[in-house]
Curated annotation (Swiss-Prot):
SUPFAM superfamilies per UniProt: ENTH/VHS domain (SSF48464), GAT-like domain (SSF89009)
All residue ranges annotated as the ENTH domain in the record: 30-163
Species for this entry: Arabidopsis thaliana
Single GO biological process annotation from the record: clathrin coat assembly
Gene Ontology cellular component list: clathrin-coated pit; clathrin-coated vesicle; Golgi apparatus
Protein's recorded name: Putative clathrin assembly protein At1g33340
Keyword line: Coated pit, Cytoplasmic vesicle, Endocytosis, Golgi apparatus, Membrane
UniProt main location, coarse: membrane
Keyword flag Coiled coil: no
């Protein structure tokens, strides 16, 4: 009972602080009334009660910043100040969730301006008091959530509605080979960094902000589904071009494959855990394909052999890899044939005519013609 009274007292005190913050906003001499409305809306969205971020308030913030020039730096300042001043887990978590929803639900222009504000240091989310505390598992989740958002702000939603890492200088690629190389050596490492932060944000044992954690984790999972599809495409492209790379590039590629093997295994475990939560069962989980370390070892061995001989992936090497995969599949039923490492078994028919210098040449030709007529 004492704990309940203490929690109730802290909540009442927090609500009083919220009203005081709104009162201070009223006496501020803002050039634009919209700035006052934005500050009040941020306080309401991140109040000390245990209610989730209100959709109505969220839409109000989006409307205000969309129709008020120069409001994004002001909004970034309000978010940074809210995180720096609060000592309440709920307020900190709701402020981070507000920032996350702004990244997810705003226009592309607002998203880009938030990215610029974070890059310039105007928007600071990593200097909060809970970043130095290890007293509670809730603090640990908030720390991991901050790390995730710092990685997430480096991604942007493209015109197709998919997440992609921000490209410096607006780099464009005109040829398919250039696009494939970019996918492997720029986007794939970014995917691995993104997934690494996702894996740290496990919602297990995150009391006392369970509802907030589940809301945040739901958004994280939805974004991880998109990034995983890009991740899978990148690994497929990496395996396809592995034997065409230089030796240093192949060594780098094999290192990425080893890291991917462990990450995807951990990602499957995380998805299985999250399916057990009521609010996350209905999410559209992707089919995560397992990557066996045995397959990576086989690729590394063939890569080393190919590097010594100085040739690309030949039919003999491809057949060797395929045979190795077939043997591994007999010992491991859990490995899916749709994995990026599954290479098709190819049978190639020689189209070279062979001329026999014997007396039965004409008869052989007739037999050949009959065989083709069939």
């Amino acid at each position: 009972m004492r704990l309940d009274l203490s929690a109730k007292f802290r909540q009442v005190l927090g609500l009083a602080k919220d009203h005081a913050s709104i009162g201070r906003a009223i006496v501020q001499n803002y050039n634009e009334k919209a700035f006052f409305d934005i500050e009040v809306a941020v306080v309401r969205a991140t109040s000390h009660d245990d209610c989730p971020v209100d959709d109505k308030t969220m839409h109000e913030i989006l409307f205000l910043v969309s129709n008020t020039p120069g409001s994004i730096p002001f909004l970034a300042e309000q978010i940074s100040r809210r995180l720096a001043k609060t000592r309440d887990c709920l307020v900190a978590g709701k402020t981070l969730l507000l920032f996350h929803r702004l990244l997810r639900g705003s226009s592309r222009s607002i998203e880009q301006q938030l990215h610029i504000a974070h890059t310039s240091g105007h928007l600071q989310i990593g200097c909060s008091w809970f970043m130095m505390s290890l007293d509670s598992r809730s603090f640990v989740f908030l720390q991991n959530y901050v790390a995730y958002l710092q990685e997430r702000v480096g991604w942007i939603i493209n015109q197709a509605g998919k997440l992609e890492p921000v490209m410096s200088g607006g780099t464009k690629f005109s040829r398919y080979k250039e696009k494939s190389m970019d996918l492997v050596f720029h986007i794939l490492p970014k995917c691995q960094e993104f997934i690494a932060q996702v894996l740290k944000c496990s919602p297990v044992d995150a009391w006392p902000i369970d509802n907030l954690v589940q809301a945040a984790t739901g958004n994280i999972l939805k974004e991880s589904f998109q990034v995983y599809m890009t991740y899978s495409d990148g690994m497929t492209a990496l395996v396809s071009m592995l034997f065409d790379l230089s030796r240093p590039a192949r060594d780098l590629a094999c290192g990425m494959l080893r890291k991917a093997s462990q990450q995807i295994q951990d990602l499957r475990i995380l998805y299985d855990k999250c399916r057990g939560f009521a609010g996350m069962k209905s999410l559209d989980y992707p089919s995560v394909q397992a990557i066996s370390m045995d397959h990576i070892v086989a690729l590394e061995e063939c890569s080393s052999y190919g590097g010594k001989r100085g040739f690309s992936l030949s039919t003999n090497l491809r057949d060797a890899i395929t045979c190795n995969e077939l043997k591994q599949e007999q010992h491991s039923a859990s490995f899916s044939s749709t994995s990026p490492f599954s290479l098709p078994v190819e049978t190639k028919i020689s189209m070279v005519w062979v001329v026999f210098d014997n007396e039965d040449g004409e008869e052989s030709d007739k037999q050949t013609e009959k065989a083709y007529e069939r």
